[in-house]
Amino acid sequence: MKTKGKAWQLVLTVLLIAAFVYTAFFGVAVKNGYVSTTYVNGAKDIRFGVDIKGGVNVTFVPSDGYDATDDQLEAAQLVIENRLVALNVTDYELYVDNNSDSLILEFPWQSGETEFDPEAAIEEIGTTAYLTFREGSSADGELVLDGSMVESAAAQYGPVNGSSSEYYVALKFTDEGAKAFGDATTRLYQTGGTISIWLDDENVSTASVNAAITDGSAIITSSASNPFTQEDVVKMARQINSGSLPFALTVDSYSTISPSLGENSLSAMVLAGVIAFALIMVLMTALYRLPGFLACIALAGQVAATLAFVSGYFPVFESFTLTLPGIAGIILAIGMGVDANVITAERIKEELRSGKSLDGALKSGFARGLTPIIDGNVTIVIVAIVLMGAFGPSDGFFAKALHFVFFAFGPSTAGTIYAFGYTLLTGVLLNFVFGIFATRIMIRGAAAIKALRDPRLYGADAPGKTPAEKKQVNFVGLRKRFLTFSACLMAAIVLCAVVLGVHLDTEFTGGAMITLSYENSFEMSAVQKTASEALGSNGLTLQTGENVATGEQTLKISMPGTETVTTNEVQTLLDSLNESYPDNSFAQLSLSNVSAAMGTKFLQKSLVAVVFALVLILAYIAYRFKNIGGLTGGMMAVLALLNDLMVVFGTFVLLRAPLDGNFIAAMLTILGYSINDTVVVYDRIRENRGLLGKKASFEELVNHSVNQSARRTIITTVTTVMALGVMCVVSKLYGLDSIFTFAFPLMMGMLSGVYTSLCVSTSAWVAWSERKGAKKN
């Protein structure tokens, strides 16, 4: 028996996953009286984004009445973005108000949170952090170099100059900085001079020059009387890497804000997740029996591991802000996890029904299922890496690797998109661990147990039962209808967009931010309707909060648009609100007309990122499927993908939902999901070409392969759509329209993905091949 001696692997793997799931969700903490010490972070320690748990709103203005130019404000915006990402604050909105020379920042934080100090973060964000090296020990000494000549800074701990170990900052200079530092140290070594290092007006280190330093590096150490702590060097390295502000900033106002998705959004999503996982477990077990049940155990481990990477469960990985787009990345990764298990279970079932023994079916099923799983996951990894490179911090690994693609846009970040890429990449890599490795260990272990060796537990038919003959659908024969329908659908979506109009969020267009104070409680939807009528805009977003300094309750109204809002219009708004709701006593606190947080450059960069990802995917498909004309197949896959993206766009238009960062995340999710569906179909075509050779025409080959892949494609999509469907229902029950307008377009895009992967991409491929063949003849 080939699986003899492996039964213990099933028990051990299940126990390890169960222990990991428990600790990942609940953490490990010891309570001693009233004091609780956390040793391992759990799901409760996840820092959720502003959209889910609320946060703080800060307005920065130049210190001492400094008159900043538009270019300086834009430069300050970039530095603050880099500092936020360095602090692992990836969910933020940062706007510039050029009229009042202010920067308005929102980032997540919850009252009572101890792992993150918002006031310390605000202080660090607003610090100028101008690094200089000067000759001598005074602040007016001759400048040797500044922070712009530093390529990177890293916090280190170890022996310095042969003495005891201490914390220090290791610097690596640019070529220009290395030359300047080498020249200065060579000269000062000969004269016995010193070099002092300054951060703003603070002398952080002064040292005698004992040798010429020409290797392009240096270290910043502390004095013996005031040694650096680990926190000191980490903060200093972070500030140096993020760059210096062009002017000093002062906090003008500071207030808390409520979740933009609603107070109950997190509870709703947890409930939706539990229900969705239960339904997936029932479906997988019903369809695939024992392998389906074991797949759900592995899937639970994958979900827990993804949350562990976000919560800071692993000490080597810092906690990460989880936003709605980040949750979308997890959903997509879960879909990929289900897909890997469905492919494997389907292959095992096929082998059993072809007459193979259980051991033979497992061996063959695992081997034949691995290639499509890898191919599908690689396409998702490509998307995730491009997103992290395009929208992550400029000193990040992927940003440096892809600098040659995005250098024209300058260094810029988009935290929510970066978070999406992070959770997506993490989830897909974990899919290899749980969806492939863990599942296979458990199935092999189960097959080694005598009571679990009945082939029917793995999908085989009962003895003597003849499998029902599967009816072949002539997908390729209907290609003209499919292609015509897709063309008409996209034309209809364009027409709807023209007739109904496309609503862009403040993130893209800029607009006005009106902050009001109020008393007592009110019905949000009613106030939103009144405000919309008073301002003549249907795209308003309302958030409640509290001013930290005064304790006043605040209402922030965001109004997208390119035209400024005047004080007279704000007065009209106040008159309407106070007339309709006299008990609330609305009063104006501030008015800011802001530029777009994600403006033209962001849209251009998004387009380049998508195109670059598609080019890489096309190249991968062309290489992997070169024996069956992979380049043409890749082009047809990209063409079919446009259908899916248009469906997502059209759904947003029909729902009259504003296009914002969540829209970008939804589009990127469908890009990865749909391409994966198509690649799995292509993999079956390649396999059948090897089996059938020239016995079948290309049309017959494609049609046979699509029929074989249809069940897997439909089941995978049903499980993911089921999760999104539950989210839609729960969000409606909880009155969370923002979640619904995110989940529903995703669901429609995935349904479109089934259609295009089975009916459009392959049909277009056959039609192209026929036309190409006709030209040759």
Model-found features: residue ranges?
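A structural signal for conserved, well-ordered secondary-structure elements
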Residues: 1-777
